[in-house]
Structure formats: structure tokens, C-alpha cells
Amino acid sequence: MSQRLTDVLQRLAATIEARKGGDPSVSYTAKLLNDPALAAKKLGEEAVETVIAAVAQGSDALAAESADLLYHWLALMAASGVSLDAVAEKLEAREGTSGIAEKASRA
């Protein structure tokens, strides 16, 4: 992953966090943060749109939908109170483990 993407995602996550407590009537992000179920629904919609872009719309559409997907994922994590460090911890625990073995360990 490029440092550029890391930096952009960190800024976006900080912006989302700053919207907590904001007015949902004027901030889409605040609206998502106030309603984790809505944030989850929007993430699902963006996931489907990302898949469609990947198989039928080309690389520019895939990049645009991926940006929407990442934004909505970050919003859902914030709305649900799950830190990105918690996600990093899970990913680190899986490093070096075969995907099949790792998945079996969660069953």
C-alpha cells in the first residue's frame, strides 16, 4: 500500500471522527454515525456497486466505487465504535497463517 493511500485514509478517518456529534440534517457523515444500521446498509450498497464496477464498468469506475466503499466502511467502523487499531490487531494475528487454516481456527 502506498504512503499516499495510508495518509488519505488517515485524514478521512479523522474527518469522520470529527463529525461525531454533528447535525445529521446537514452532515451525511453525522447521519451515518448516528445510525449504525444505516451505515451498514450503505456499506452493503457500496459493496455491490464496487463488484458491478469490477466486472462491468472498468478501472475508473472501480476506483471511484472503491473510494465510496472505503468511506462507508470507515463510517460504519466509527458508528459502531470499532477502532481501526482493533482491525489491525486482527489482521496482524492472521499474518503468516494460511487462509484455510486461519478460517478453520475461527469455526
Swiss-Prot record:
Recorded metabolic or biological pathway in which this protein acts: Amino-acid biosynthesis; L-histidine biosynthesis; L-histidine from 5-phospho-alpha-D-ribose 1-diphosphate: step 2/9
Taxonomic placement: Bacteria, Pseudomonadati, Pseudomonadota, Alphaproteobacteria, Caulobacterales
NCBIfam families found in the cross-reference section: histidine_hisI, PRK00400.1-5
Broad enzyme group: hydrolase
Organism: Caulobacter vibrioides (strain NA1000 / CB15N)
Full protein name: Phosphoribosyl-ATP pyrophosphatase
Reactions this protein catalyses: 1-(5-phospho-beta-D-ribosyl)-ATP + H2O = 1-(5-phospho-beta-D-ribosyl)-5'-AMP + diphosphate + H(+)
Alphabetically ordered keywords of this record: Amino-acid biosynthesis, ATP-binding, Cytoplasm, Histidine biosynthesis, Hydrolase, Nucleotide-binding
EC number: 3.6.1.31
Pfam families: PRA-PH
Homology family: Belongs to the PRA-PH family.
Gene Ontology process terms (BP): L-histidine biosynthetic process
Subcellular location: Cytoplasm
A GO cellular-component term linked to this record: cytoplasm
InterPro entries in the cross-refs: HisE, PRib-ATP_PPHydrolase-like
